[in-house]
Amino acid sequence: MVNWLERTELLFSKEQMDRLKNAHVLIVGLGGIGSFAGEFIARAGIGKMTIIDGDVFDPTNKNRQLTALDSTIGINKAVVLAQRIKDINPDIQLNIVEEFVLPERVWELLDEHQPDYVMDCIDSVTPKLEWLIACKRKKIKITIGHTNGNWAEVIKGDIQITDMILVPTLKK
């Protein structure tokens, strides 16, 4: 049987491949950015993923979301992406959370799943800020992705709360 990561292994050392295999990435928001990110991360050989989204597909998603198809209309985005990820890598450890994450749930989800990295691809500002605050306090690396019509932005690195907006309440 051919090693499906053979081409990836040409790019990375054994140590780097082991780091990927042992890493856990949590992606919240599986629409225009999150659906592509989830698939690309799975194809890189990540060992464990937690994918979170409470939304279901509707026809208007088809122009911009990887897993939005006629056959997936009305189905939860995390469930659909999970099937696709498992088709790519049947050995991946995959946690599926079918939930719109309220700000007060962010801390619980981080404690429950304990990811090494978080990719925030949600649209709502208040939960987005809570993910940023929680990850900063827990020293979890976070990347923030956001789209709005005709533009997209991905922010990584040392993001400060003041880079976004002022937060009305800080918890924990």
Where are these regions (language model features)?
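Adenine nucleotide-associated cytosolic modules
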Residues: 1-172
